[in-house]
Amino acid sequence: MPLFGSTFSPKKTPPRKSASLSNLHNLDRSTREVELGLDYGTPTMNLAGQSLKFENGQWIAETGISGGVDRREAQRLRRRNQQLEEENNLLRLKVDILLDMLSETTAESHLMEKELDELKSVSRRRK
């Protein structure tokens, strides 16, 4: 028997209400399309003056030429973009190396200045 009253007994939760009173889920796809007009067709969008449609998991330009840029031009631009990214990565690496060299040289110069100051103070004491 518990010291301060009865044992823990949570309140019973009320039963859930039915999720949907609609019978739309009972209809097959073709009936829903006819009755409700749910035939949307392929998704399309207009981006920067270029009309695209979604087919087989990919966005495809509706015209043969995608907004004035043909496939060869797009491929050339991709290659140029790749070259520029590689060049950018190389330049970042060079900057990192130069910064490392600068910090190393700065540390060495501070050490030399410190040694020089110590030698000057020792030579002053001897005089």
UniProtKB/Swiss-Prot annotation:
Q: Which residues cross the membrane?
A: none
List the InterPro entries hit by this protein, alphabetically. Chibby_fam
The entry's keywords:
Cell projection, Cilium, Cilium biogenesis/degradation, Coiled coil, Cytoplasm, Cytoskeleton, Differentiation, Flagellum, Golgi apparatus, Nucleus, Phosphoprotein
For bias kind Polar residues, which ranges apply?
Answer: 1-10
Region feature Leucine-zipper, mapped onto this chain:
77-98
Task: Quote the subcellular location field of this record.
Answer: Nucleus speckle; Cytoplasm, Cytoskeleton, Cilium basal body; Cytoplasm, Cytoskeleton, Microtubule organizing center, Centrosome, Centriole; Golgi apparatus
Question: What is the recorded name of this protein?
Answer: Protein chibby homolog 1
Q: Origin organism of this chain?
A: Bos taurus
